[in-house]
């Protein structure tokens, strides 16, 4: 859990993913298209990935635990949540508030 907190606070936008996850790819692409440059942590390529995945579930991440998105050091949700925030316009404002994007 400590590693999740540490990694999620190092950059304005952080996404925990798995390299083979299509929804993870979609969320990363959305962030890039909005002008953000999130830190990406591929759990399937990290020796502590399984442990971090359990920690993400404990934070309230859904099943599957990825993508798990943090903005401004705060967990904001998984793919379903991020798409909802994008549709209602609040994702862009969250990214602006966290200084992950400027425009």
Curated annotation (Swiss-Prot):
Domain of life: Eukaryota
SUPFAM superfamilies: Thioredoxin-like
Span of domain Glutaredoxin: 1-102
Pfam families: Glutaredoxin
GO cellular component annotations of the record: cytoplasm
Coiled coil (residue ranges): none
Disulfide-bond pairs as recorded: 21-24
Compartments, as annotated in UniProt: Cytoplasm
Any GO BP annotation: negative regulation of transcription by RNA polymerase II
Keywords attached to this entry: Cytoplasm, Disulfide bond, Electron transport, Redox-active center, Transport
Cleaved signal peptide residues: none
InterPro entries per the UniProt record, alphabetical: GlrX-like_pln_2 (IPR011905), Glutaredoxin (IPR002109), Glutaredoxin_subgr (IPR014025), Thioredoxin-like_sf (IPR036249)
Family: Belongs to the glutaredoxin family. CC-type subfamily.
Record's function text: Has a glutathione-disulfide oxidoreductase activity in the presence of NADPH and glutathione reductase. Reduces low molecular weight disulfides and proteins.
Listed name of the protein: Glutaredoxin-C11
Organism of provenance: Arabidopsis thaliana
Gene for this chain: GRXC11
């Amino acid at each position: 859990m400590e590693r999740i907190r540490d990694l999620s606070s190092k950059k304005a936008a952080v996404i925990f993913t798995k390299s083979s996850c299509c929804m993870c790819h979609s969320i990363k692409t959305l962030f890039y298209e909005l002008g953000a440059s999130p830190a990406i942590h591929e759990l399937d390529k990290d020796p502590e990935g399984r442990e971090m995945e359990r920690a993400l579930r404990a934070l309230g991440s859904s099943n599957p635990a990825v993508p798990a998105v943090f903005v401004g050091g705060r967990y904001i949700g998984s793919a379903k949540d991020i798409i909802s925030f994008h549709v209602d316009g609040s994702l862009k404002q969250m990214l602006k508030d966290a200084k992950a994007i400027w425009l």
